[in-house]
């Protein structure tokens, strides 16, 4: 069965590198990029480009549409990155709402066999001064008081969406 890797944020640093490595392995790749993003020029030429907006559930649904007999694996790298607090609403809309839209689209497309979410170290709750942060291997409830900054909060909230079952039903 043919597999297509669906990569969001493909015009960003992480997404571009994910696309390049998948192509190097010989995989087929479809990239979700924001319409009009000038950084699309960095996406490898062999990648199928899909222009859309993560805040649009319809665009996310279209991104997952494939020919019968094709399975997909989604690697969700996309996020808005800023430390400017004036963009807090947009950060939540893109990073949390966009992730929720992608998860819903994946759930609506049974040919999507895996959904891989790229989070951030910022999503890890901060500990009191002097305590060491250790790898998190299980669900850690989101705590607004322990995640500092809107970008980190948005990534922590989006991560929580990915931990919330069921992804498949």
Say what each PLM segment does.
Residues 146-169:
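Active-site Tyr-X1-5-Lys
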Residues 17, 21, 105, 161:
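Rossmann-fold NAD(P)-dependent oxidoreductase module
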Residues 15-16, 96, 156:
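Residues forming the Rossmann-fold NAD(P)(H) cofactor-binding site
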Residues 4-25:
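N-terminal Rossmann NAD(P)H-binding glycine-rich loop of SDR-like oxidoreductase domains
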Residues 8, 32, 74-78, 115-121:
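SDR active-site strand-loop-helix element
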Residues 100-150:
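Conserved Rossmann-fold NAD(P)-dependent oxidoreductase catalytic core, especially the SDR/UDP-sugar
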Residues 27-36:
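Conserved glycine-rich Rossmann-like NAD(P)H-binding loop of the short-chain dehydrogenase/reductase
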Residues 38, 47, 51-97, 101:
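NAD(P)H-binding glycine-rich loop region in Rossmannoid oxidoreductase-like domains
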